[in-house]
């Protein structure tokens, strides 16, 4: 912050546009969800946010994937209580990101377009981000 106040700006490297390097951020104060496709200084509620470090799928909730009408219908085995729920699901494939916000007391199921081979991310408010690569 001092550098910014003194007129010094540190520039990031140009974004290569590779969505496989997408980083997710969640504000601990307000729950705001942000993402970047490259290196970024992300702030919310006056705090600098660090990118979430995804856990491997073995550490996350079990998921069931069905192919229905040209889409993935995904259900997660996870509680959806006010203090412990899945906050979002994101599916990243090539140059596209599909994002669904989830809420407490809602069913933990969602749909994404059928693009095999992408990566699914689920964010739990208590346990963090889980990465599920190579969805088929």
Language-model-derived ranges and their functions:
Residues 33-34, 48-49, 128:
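Cys/His-rich microdomains that often coordinate metals
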Residues 73-77, 107-115:
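Exposed aromatic-hydrophobic patches
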Residues 49-63:
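Short metal-binding segments enriched for Cys and/or His
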Residues 27-30, 44, 124:
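Short cysteine-rich clusters marking metal-coordination/redox-active sites
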Residues 126-136:
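Edge beta-strands of extracellular beta-sandwich domains
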Residues 24, 41, 121:
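Residues immediately within or flanking Cys/His clusters that coordinate Zn2+
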Residues 38-49:
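Cysteine-rich micro-motifs
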Residues 15-21, 33-37, 115:
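Short, flexible, mixed-charge glycine/proline-rich loop motifs
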């Amino acid at each position: 912050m001092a550098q910014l106040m003194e007129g010094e700006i540190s520039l990031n490297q140009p974004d290569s546009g590779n969505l496989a390097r997408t980083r997710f951020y969640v504000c601990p104060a307000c729950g705001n969800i942000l993402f970047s496709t490259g290196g970024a200084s992300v702030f919310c509620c006056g705090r600098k946010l660090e990118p979430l470090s995804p856990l491997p799928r073995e550490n996350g909730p079990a998921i069931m994937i069905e192919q229905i009408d040209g889409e993935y219908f995904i259900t997660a085995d996870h509680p959806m209580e006010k203090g412990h729920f899945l906050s979002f699901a994101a599916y990243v494939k090539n140059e596209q990101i599909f994002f669904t916000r989830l809420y407490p007391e809602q069913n933990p199921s969602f749909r994404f377009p059928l693009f095999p081979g992408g990566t699914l991310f689920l964010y739990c408010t208590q346990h963090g981000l889980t990465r599920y690569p190579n969805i088929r």
